[in-house]
Structure formats: structure tokens, C-alpha cells
A protein has these predicted regions:
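Glycan-recognition and catalytic cores of secretory/periplasmic carbohydrate-active enzymes
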Residues: 1-249
Length: 249
């Protein structure tokens, strides 16, 4: 149980799922749990700020919208300013994928889109900061530029600006899933001009076509998408299903 009391990306993803469950069902117990979780973590003291510890901020911002509790609002404003002006940048101004205990010098990872960019985008809408919204869109474009594999429609996990390479050029399932569900979330969070919206949708559809081509017979996806000898991975499969369903809707 103790690991669920940590402030990290894994908890952040789960919290966002719980918040969306609350919005769907109106279950007040779920919302009260979320408020209690944030109150307890804030009382304990928050961890260092990085890409992954930004993930829980997305749901906190949602909770702030519903409660207008300025304890939450003040933290969200301050953290969003840190993302915009304090988070380390690497090549082309991309957010460096700095995480707890590792700065990941000069490295870009696709995970950042879900972990950090979604929060910045929503903060731009909630706080009326157009610069946040524009930066969120730009970060998506830069990540697509370096991580999208035009030969097949899938994504590489990362890019090293020092070595100028995509590591082993591996199409990792969970990494790809951050784009599948993340880009659908982004489109729902912020206003996007028609041309850019179409571009995001086109890259999404190209990825989905590629994913369908490498889906296993039982509906799962392998952890290396185009390597059927690699094990099947449930978290990526769930994220792909989520993103695809949201795309259809």
C-alpha cells in the first residue's frame, strides 16, 4: 500500500484515471479520496520537481477546477511556471527527460508528452496563459520531429542530442502508448487550430494503422511492437485501447 502514497508518474497516471472515473460516474467517494490523497502528500512535503513528478499535477489541476481551493491552485500555478521556465531544455528547446535521481542529460523521451506536457497545456487553459498552450503544442511537434519513425508510423522511445541517435531504434510498446493516449488527451484539453489538429490526427492515425498491423492474435501487443518474440505487455495494451477508443469517439 505504501507505494501508492508516493508522488511519482505511476501514481499520477492512476490518479488521472480515478478522476475521469469520478467525472463519468459522479462517485463522490472517489473525488473525496483524491482530495485526501493530495492533502496528505502536500502535508508531508513534495518531492523534487522533474518530468515524472509533474504527472500528478494534471489531476490536482482538475481537482482545483472543481473545488477552487487555492491551496491547490497556488501549487499548480507555481509548478506550471517551473515547467515553463525552470525545466531543463535540450536540443530544439525540447524538455529534457529529467527524472528522480537522473538528469538524463541531452535526452528526450516520448513519455514527457503525457507526464508533463498535458499538465502545462491544461494549466494554460485554466489560468488563461496562452504561452503555456503554445509551448505545449510546440513540445508535441518537437517530440514528433525526433521520435516519429516515418518508415513505419511507430515511435522510438527517445533521442540523444549528444550522440544524435534514437538509441537502439526500438519501437517500445509503452513508449508508443504515451503518444496514442496523450495526443488524444491534448486535443481534448486545449483549442488547436485546424491545420495543426489535422496534423496531430494524421500522425495518430498512422500510428494506429501500424499498431493494428503488429497486434497479436489475442488482442495484446508485444513489449517490442514489431518483435513477436518479446513478451506481451498489458499496460501498453490498455493505453492503446484507451487512445483508440477516445480517437473513435
Amino acid at each position: 500500500i505504501s507505494k501508492y502514497q508516493l508522488w511519482e508518474w505511476t501514481q499520477g497516471v492512476g490518479l488521472y484515471g480515478l478522476y475521469n472515473y469520478y467525472k463519468l460516474t459522479g462517485d463522490r467517494g472517489t473525488f473525496d479520496f483524491l482530495c485526501g490523497w493530495y492533502d496528505a502528500r502536500m502535508a508531508e512535503g513534495l518531492p523534487e520537481r522533474n518530468v515524472n513528478t509533474t504527472c500528478p499535477m494534471l489531476t490536482l489541476l482538475c481537482v482545483y477546477e472543481d473545488t477552487q481551493d487555492e491551496r491547490y491552485g497556488a501549487l499548480c500555478r507555481d509548478w506550471a511556471e517551473w515547467v515553463m521556465h525552470g525545466l531543463i531544455r535540450t536540443g530544439d528547446g525540447a524538455f529534457q527527460h529529467m527524472i528522480t535521481g537522473d538528469a538524463n542529460d541531452s535526452q528526450m523521451l516520448i513519455d514527457t508528452l503525457f507526464m508533463t506536457v498535458l499538465f502545462l497545456a491544461k494549466a494554460g487553459v485554466v489560468f488563461g496563459r496562452k504561452d503555456y498552450v503554445e509551448e505545449a503544442k510546440r513540445q508535441c511537434l518537437v517530440h514528433i520531429k525526433y521520435l516519429y519513425d516515418t518508415s513505419c508510423g511507430l515511435y522510438f522511445h527517445g533521442y540523444d542530442f549528444k550522440g544524435r541517435h534514437n538509441y537502439g531504434r526500438v519501437h517500445w510498446a509503452r513508449g508508443n502508448s504515451w503518444y496514442t493516449c496523450g495526443i488524444m488527451e491534448l486535443i481534448g484539453l486545449i483549442p488547436i487550430e485546424p491545420g495543426l489538429r489535422q496534423y496531430f490526427l494524421d500522425t495518430f492515425r498512422a500510428q494506429v494503422d501500424a499498431l493494428c498491423a503488429c497486434q497479436a492474435g489475442d488482442g495484446m501487443w508485444h513489449t517490442i511492437l514489431d518483435d513477436p518474440a518479446s513478451y506481451k505487455e498489458s499496460s501498453a495494451t490498455a493505453a492503446f485501447a484507451y487512445g483508440m477508443l477516445k480517437g473513435v469517439r
